[in-house]
């Protein structure tokens, strides 16, 4: 038995290692840990996060399709759920999104633009928009800004089916 909770497992692009968040029983401390996929042996801890009340890892890390030495992850380390960029040495490279709003989820990547597609309530607390952020931190809303949006990406991430509605718009689907 263990006093740890394991969650958000992700494979490395080369499939030789796996990454997971290990939480203490109180769920106030979490560590991103790398393991050898064949032996199950712990290789190293990349970083740790702490919250006095509750640490909630929301999603596994996601490696950049154009650079397998870097990954993104969601964290509330600044008080809001945002996207962070790190490398496989555990170094935090950049906070990609910032502000008094929440990133709901990472939808995928636009490989040619080297950007992340995500959903957030940046425009309004009562909206959910589809947004993009580049590795330089520059971000923008995709498509119609009003309403509640969900998205389906093409394989390349260059095209998006934007499903949305609002109090004045019945369900609509746009190609962006």
State the predicted function of each range.
Residues 1-176:
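Peripheral, non-catalytic segments that deliver or gate enzyme domains
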């Amino acid at each position: 038995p263990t006093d740890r909770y394991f969650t958000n497992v992700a494979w490395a692009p080369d499939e030789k290692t796996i990454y997971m968040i290990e939480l203490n029983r109180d769920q106030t401390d979490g560590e991103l840990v790398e393991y050898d996929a064949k032996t199950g042996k712990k290789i190293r801890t990349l970083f740790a996060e702490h919250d006095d009340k509750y640490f909630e890892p929301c999603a596994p890390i996601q490696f950049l399709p154009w650079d397998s030495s870097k990954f993104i992850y969601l964290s509330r380390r600044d008080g809001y759920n945002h996207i962070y960029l790190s490398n496989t040495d555990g170094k935090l490279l950049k906070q990609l999104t910032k502000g008094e709003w929440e990133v709901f989820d990472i939808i995928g990547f636009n490989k040619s633009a080297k950007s992340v597609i995500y959903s957030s309530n940046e425009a309004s607390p009562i909206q959910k928009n589809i947004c993009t952020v580049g590795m330089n931190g520059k971000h923008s809303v995709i498509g119609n800004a009003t309403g509640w949006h969900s998205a389906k990406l093409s394989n390349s991430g260059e095209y998006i089916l934007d499903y949305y509605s609002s109090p004045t718009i019945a369900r609509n689907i746009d190609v962006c």
